[in-house]
């Protein structure tokens, strides 16, 4: 993330923003105006950043391209011929005693179910298959969330674990280079690891083994949440989705948080 902030304009928002609607208001006010915004959310010891990919030129900078065509071709190439990242030793991390209450979950719209992490990247490895995907998390308390998991590759790994009476170990990262977000939002075939896709997009990527599960997580991730995508289910939603309407309430897997680490 930090290396990306060095190549774009950054606007620092003063003060501390309330989780209830103020984060949403500020993000909306600055959307499409150019800068990435950096701000502090109440209860969080770290800065947060938003509007990293709200304009096309930021996507170009993140991918190192100069046009839509170059972006498409680079993403397609990375999905078809991903590259293994370099494995390094784990950095010094600080355990967040407040758990999920120390990460920048916020409420964006009045009828939403509660505080949300809107774009957390879940990394899971099971049965020799690794996956990284973006999922929203409804924060219930410092050790519990509910995760919207669409029926794709993470769901497949979850069902495999569940069929054996197991919870799925997951490492959830927040605050990464936007090229990693692009890779996590892509759709390679099952078995292609999106972190490898990100490594190809960036030319190289450094990862380390997460402290609890040993999952490969990108070096420099601002937050690493070690948890279990459990067999327990709970209501998730409503939540305003990408088309601006309230997504319906569903029973979804409960995230049981084991540890939260901050850079």
Predicted regions and their residues:
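Extended, highly charged
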Residues: 1-239, 244-254, 258-263
């Amino acid at each position: 993330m930090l290396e990306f902030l060095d190549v774009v304009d950054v606007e620092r928002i003063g003060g501390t923003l309330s989780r209830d609607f103020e984060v949403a208001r500020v993000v909306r006010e600055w959307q499409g105006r150019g800068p990435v915004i950096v701000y502090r959310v109440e209860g969080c010891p770290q800065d947060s950043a938003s509007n990293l990919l709200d304009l096309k030129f930021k996507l170009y900078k993140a991918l190192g391209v100069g046009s839509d065509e170059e972006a498409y071709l680079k993403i397609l190439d990375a999905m078809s011929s991903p590259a293994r990242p370099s494995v390094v030793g784990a950095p010094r991390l600080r355990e967040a005693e407040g758990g999920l209450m120390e990460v920048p979950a916020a409420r964006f719209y009045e009828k939403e179910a509660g505080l949300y992490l809107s774009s957390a990247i879940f990394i899971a490895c099971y049965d020799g298959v690794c996956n990284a995907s973006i999922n929203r998390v409804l924060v219930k308390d410092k050790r519990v969330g509910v995760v919207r998991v669409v029926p794709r590759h993470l769901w497949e790994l979850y069902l495999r674990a569940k069929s054996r009476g197991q919870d799925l170990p997951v490492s959830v990262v927040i605050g990464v280079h936007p090229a990693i977000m692009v890779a996590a939002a892509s759709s390679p075939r099952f078995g292609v690891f999106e972190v490898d896709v990100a490594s190809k997009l960036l030319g190289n990527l450094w990862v380390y083994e997460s402290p609890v599960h040993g999952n490969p997580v990108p070096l420099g991730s601002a937050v690493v949440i070690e948890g279990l995508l459990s067999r327990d289910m709970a209501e998730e939603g409503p939540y305003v989705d990408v088309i601006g309407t309230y997504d319906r309430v569903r029973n979804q897997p409960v995230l049981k948080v084991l540890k939260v680490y901050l850079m």
